Amino acid sequence: MKPSVVMIEPNGHFCSDCAIRTSAVCSSLDAAELREFEHLGRRVHFSSGETVFSEEDITTSFYNVLEGVMRLYKLLPDGRRQIVGFALPGDFLGMNLSGRHNFSADAIGAVTVCQFAKAPFGRFIEERPQLLRRINELAIRELSQARDHMVLLGRRSADEKVAAFLLGWRERLLALKGASDTVPLPMSRQDIADYLGLTIETVSRTFTKLERHGAIAIIHGGISLLDPARVEALAAA
């Protein structure tokens, strides 16, 4: 299935009306720059499971996530999948040094992105140092998340990994949805396992164990933190 594409018209005001305007890559632009910026992008809608881009593809576009969650992953030589991250609204994808994507991305549920062709986007930022600074900020944030993931994959128990994942995911959602003890988990248990370097059976047992100990409640589409302090102590172990 091909994604449906909606071109951004110059008078559509898609950027100024964007729900993530204040946190997106374009947040550093003024009103006049934003109107020019609208000409560069197009909105693309992906259904659940559709590929946004594939590892080793030549990078021809940048992607600003507007709605939904994306799964970012690499395939190992033996066919196993290692999930390297999950992209949320406001995340900016496509930055790399090699000119090729170094991971694949597909949609978890419905996803909408703002897609920018690489060459005109590059020309646009050359005259706008504030936009380049914003891109650098996003790149530093991505690097920080990658380092956190490396620590998560290190010498930690399954309980510690799952607890740290839940708190880290909750923290990322905080900026989008505000504080809440309910943590939506749009990804599958298999996705979480592939992110943490565990088996799906271990992840499922750990969720059940945390619920049995009164730390969380497993609800439809996610979990509820019943005892955040207990989960925080476990994640910090």
Curated annotation (Swiss-Prot):
Q: Which domain of life is it from?
A: Bacteria
Q: Which residues form the HTH crp-type domain?
A: 156-229
UniProt keyword terms in alphabetical order: Activator, DNA-binding, Nitrogen fixation, Transcription, Transcription regulation
**SMART domains reported for this sequence:** cNMP (SM00100), HTH_CRP (SM00419)
Q: Name one GO biological process term.
A: nitrogen fixation
Q: What induces it?
A: Its expression is maximal under reduced oxygen conditions and depends on the two-component regulatory system FixLJ.
Under Gene Ontology molecular function, one entry of this record is: DNA-binding transcription factor activity
Q: Which SUPFAM superfamilies did the record assign? A: cAMP-binding domain-like (SSF51206), Winged helix' DNA-binding domain (SSF46785)
Q: Does the keyword Transcription regulation apply?
A: yes
Annotated region of DNA binding: 189-208
A cellular-component GO term for this protein: cytosol
| Extra information | Possesses 4 cysteines which may bind a metal ion (possibly iron).
Protein purpose: B.japonicum has two FixLJ-dependent FixK homologs that are activators of the transcription of a group of genes involved in anaerobic processes such as denitrification and possibly nitrogen fixation. FixK may bind DNA at the FNR consensus binding site.
State what protein this is by name.
Nitrogen fixation regulation protein FixK
Q: Which species is listed as the source?
A: Bradyrhizobium diazoefficiens (strain JCM 10833 / BCRC 13528 / IAM 13628 / NBRC 14792 / USDA 110)
